[in-house]
Amino acid sequence: MKVMRTTVATVVAATLSMSAFSVFAEASLTGAGATFPAPVYAKWADTYQKETGNKVNYQGIGSSGGVKQIIANTVDFGASDAPLSDEKLAQEGLFQFPTVIGGVVLAVNIPGLKSGELVLDGKTLGDIYLGKIKKWDDEAIAKLNPGLKLPSQNIAVVRRADGSGTSFVFTSYLAKVNEEWKNNVGTGSTVKWPIGLGGKGNDGIAAFVQRLPGAIGYVEYAYAKQNNLAYTKLISADGKPVSPTEENFANAAKGADWSKTFAQDLTNQKGEDAWPITSTTFILIHKDQKKPEQGTEVLKFFDWAYKTGAKQANDLDYASLPDSVVEQVRAAWKTNIKDSSGKPLY
């Protein structure tokens, strides 16, 4: 899969302009939140700028920050990898919808090791993040990698320092595959990490792993590839070693029942070559739009992304949503996103 080598900055900005009423009217949108989808949002915004002239400014500040900003009405849309509960959505008057499917991978810095050479399973990975496995040549790791020469090197564990949807996805997986992690740490955008150096954003973790020999850190796949980081294979729910690819992220989503809720948990799914740490990512928007022109432009941007952004997402190794899910999202926009008079914005 061809990977775009664009550097992902913390602030992703693109310039666009389009209006239903005048080609000279400029629409400017602001969004903030998850760093997990920031590479594809950057690419979409850049292309949308060239095609329409509209402005979209997206700040990758972490999912927790995105939720806070949309609740505070300081942005036009928020972004989070951790879906809000139905109760929280109702309380804040928000609607959430998915955009793309991606994967969290384990990036490692072991001298001489290439991507896909090291295999880990969920139990072993959890024990690393619990601080129980401290060296790369530990017996548990060696057993999964017969024939691979592992260094007697300390493992430098890297995790997120900020509230993070990527952490939510990662800890959701660990809670399914490591009983001690489930009982003592649990799942969340922020947890009480047993050990580890904290990095801000996916790019912060990638930078730590790049600098620290012996490091391991969890990042969205595009960040590992853009930073030329080696990443591991994982043992799937079917007991097979699998690689992170756009196709295998899509495989993890095949069994999901999207008709009941958009908030699907795609971690540790069974299915041919399903990547174990797969997730969709979400946009948050107010249902009752006080500035309907802004709400309309948000929907236009993501409608455009659904129609024309699939190849760009795939080039960055995200999987597109199934067409049936996109149609469900559009139908939900019509019934949920309205102006103060109750008129649908889509």
From Swiss-Prot:
It comes from the Bacteria. InterPro entries: ABC_phos-bd_PstS, PBP_domain, Phosphate-bind_PstS. Keywords: Periplasm, Phosphate transport, Signal, Stress response, Transport. It is found in: Periplasm. CDD domains: PBP2_phosphate_binding (cd01006). SUPFAM superfamilies: Periplasmic binding protein-like II. GO terms for biological process: DNA damage response; phosphate ion transmembrane transport; phosphate ion transport; response to radiation. GO terms for molecular function: phosphate ion binding. Residues 1-25 form the signal peptide. Pfam families: PBP_like_2. Belongs to the PstS family. PANTHER family: PHOSPHATE-BINDING PROTEIN PSTS (PTHR42996:SF1). Part of the ABC transporter complex PstSACB involved in phosphate import. This is Phosphate-binding protein PstS. It comes from Escherichia coli (strain K12). The lineage of its organism: Bacteria, Pseudomonadati, Pseudomonadota, Gammaproteobacteria, Enterobacterales.
